[in-house]
Amino acid sequence: MGKKGKVGKSRRDKFYHLAKETGYRSRSAFKLIQLNRRFQFLQKARALLDLCAAPGGWLQVAAKFMPVSSLIVGVDLVPIKPLPNVVTLQEDITTERCRQALRKELKTWKVDVVLNDGAPNVGASWVHDAYSQAHLTLMALRLACDFLARGGCFITKVFRSRDYQPLLWIFQQLFHRVQATKPQASRHESAEIFVVCQGFLAPDKVDAKFFDPKFAFKEVEVQAKTVTELVTKKKPKAEGYAEGDLTLYHRTSVTDFLRAANPVDFLSKASEISIDDKELAQHPATTEDIRACCQDIKVLGRKELRSLLNWRTKLRRYVAKKLKEQAKALDISLSSEEEGDEEESAAETKQASEEEEEREEEEQLNRTLAEMKAQEVAELKRKKKKLLREQRKQRERVELKMDLPGVSIADEGETGMFSLRTIRGQQLLEEVTQGDMNAADTFLSDLPRDDIYVSDAEDDDDTSLESDLDPEELAGVRTHSDQKEQKSLQFAQVDDSKEEEGENPLLVPLEEKAVLQEEQASLWFSKDGFSGIDDDADEALEISQAQLLYKSRQKEQQPTDPPPPPTNLKTEKKSSQCQNEVPKETEAITDTGGEDRDSSDSDSSSSEDEDDWKVSRGKKRSRGSKADEDGFEVVPIEDPVKYRILDPEGLALGAVIASSKKAKRDLIDNSFNRYAFNEEEEELPEWFVQEEKQHRIRQLPLDKKEVEHYRKRWREINARPIKKVAEAKARKKRRMLKKLEQTKKKAEAVVNTVDISEREKVAQLRSLYKKAGLGKEKRQVTYVVAKKGVGRKVRRPAGVRGHFKVVDSRMKKDQRAQRKEQKRNHRRK
């Protein structure tokens, strides 16, 4: 029967599933994300202290949103699993030990943000739980005041209870701005709210009573008011009336209405407007409706009030025109002296008006230019947005494999690949040299960004291919490619004169092969390394002559020929080559002319010459030589010493021999003992030889620490991978990283898709990672030793989970015996 999960209080809501998908340790991480989205306190913080931080969801959010080099410290009663770039402490925030540990960790630093998401163990009673949480918040505030920098933030969780208001009052005394909020991720049925305190005042001294719960949460007794206090002693002054205004009815004239600076305010205070001027009363704009509206303004609506304002505007224009006419008539009647003064004042007025007009025109021009510039900037922004939108759509199409990068449906007839053979004549050559750079720029800008990485990937594949091949295989591949290039050059020399319309000025005919080889040889031998090659050739001749003389003397001293070495196909081939080369050497001894240089210029290496000489040594001895008469003293050539790889005991013994001559003499003297085994191993049985080596060996006076030191060095050397293995692992890692990047891009495209459901997204993501081979995990196999009397079918043993394999103890013994047999056979060889 299936086990029923905990679904009370809608525990598994969307934030629960989001925390599972995004990797947060708790759903409360989204509370901090939403608080930071509103108040923006994590982006500018350089140091953060998280109290009651387990299991570490808020620490994960802080590490994500804060700068990389920030200091993040988390404290809780229970241990917190390690997080990158986060320091965790297991302490009680109500104790002095926690304060000392924080001082040790922070040193002289002051934190910018203090977080507190702590809550006590609940379940006793609501009143007790609320008080415990308020007391815990007060202790967190006490720690925050010790380590918070000036202007820092303090974010804490508080339960809504009767202790909430005292806490809020204490926060307001210590911080500049205090706001209470409830993020969307907090459950509606929960009594928790979050208080964000910003702008820490950092007072020089804080009263200890603030952090004493007995004083902070003390109930204040409200004294009851007496009846005499409730009775008002003096009647308050009436409000809403202007001082000195004894009546509410105000009658005004039309002249006052026309002179009013604020006509709307004038109409709100007036009750009636009397038309006392005859000219204004006879004006065409003064209709019967206007007269009726002027009699009682308090009852007018918006439409009638607007008609009164329009009537006022017409009357003001009429009065202004009339005043101008009167001013002109008055100017005519002025005397000549007054006329001069008037002209000067008029000129000044005209000049001032012209300056005012110029200023207005300049301001208008500046406004027009600013508007045009703003329109141009808006147009550029619109074009840029459009271009970015098209590029994003193209990238999404490529990521979703709806379109291939670099493939266009348009015709590619004229925009094919460039070829020299298409240029025929001087005119086409000039067109190519001039070029169309604008077209090239537009072509490059139209290309998608994904095409940029194609050439790099191809180069990486070529380099990885060269690193995979051995030197011999690489040389063979290069030789094969050179032969192909030579064949292609030979075919390119064939000239089809009938099909060509003109001569291509860029195609140059190739020279003959012999001429090219001679030029390459002359360039090669003109290097500085071949400057003293003549002297080297003379020395080589002298050495070869000395070797021949020494061989002939050894041949005379030996009565019988040595047995011929075992020959195979390679040795026979080399011996035949050596027989052909012997006469050339004798000719080189007698004649040191141009042939000497030719023989020294051969491409064969010195190691091959030495091998050939060793193979043909038996045949040269049988021929004999007349070189004894020359009287050369030949020094015998010693065979190269074969170095033996020492085990840790041998290395320790060598260190003792190299460090002390006395120890060396003692070791040599002690080697002559009764355990010395001087018999020939071939004449004795193998089992006897092995037992003697195992049991009749005298222990060497070696230091165990020294032997262990060399054994450890050997283990370190053996643990290092060889170059080919390291390169193969690096190539495999590079391929996996490349595949992972491609899969991530596809996964982002799937996640950003809106048309499919979450279940379909998860299925597509699983298929993507399965195709990329990133979700494969090696299956763990548990080996279980079978007991006697157990049949073929074995039940799952107790305590074993997952895949298990039953093995036999007999199998272990057989494998041990096989290893011994292989070791024995290896010794025989």
Swiss-Prot record:
There is a cross-link at residues 570, 626, 642, 661, 693 (Glycyl lysine isopeptide (Lys-Gly) (interchain with G-Cter in SUMO2)). Interacts with NIP7. Citrullinated by PADI4. The gene is Ftsj3. Its main location: nucleus. One of its GO terms (molecular function) is RNA 2'-O-methyltransferase activity. Residues 336-346, 354-363, 456-473 have a biased composition (Acidic residues). Residues 794-804 have a biased composition (Basic residues). It catalyses: a ribonucleotide in rRNA + S-adenosyl-L-methionine = a 2'-O-methylribonucleotide in rRNA + S-adenosyl-L-homocysteine + H(+). GO terms for cellular component: chromosome; nucleolus; nucleoplasm; preribosome, large subunit precursor; preribosome, small subunit precursor. Its EC number is 2.1.1.-. InterPro entries: RNA_methyltr_RlmE, RNA_MeTrfase_FtsJ_dom, rRNA-MeTfrase_E, rRNA_MeTfrase_SPB1-like_C, rRNA_MeTfrase_Spb1_DUF3381, SAM-dependent_MTases_sf, SPB1-like. The active site is at residue 157. This is pre-rRNA 2'-O-ribose RNA methyltransferase FTSJ3. Residues 332-367, 443-508, 528-634, 794-829 are annotated as: Disordered. It is found in: Nucleus, Nucleolus.
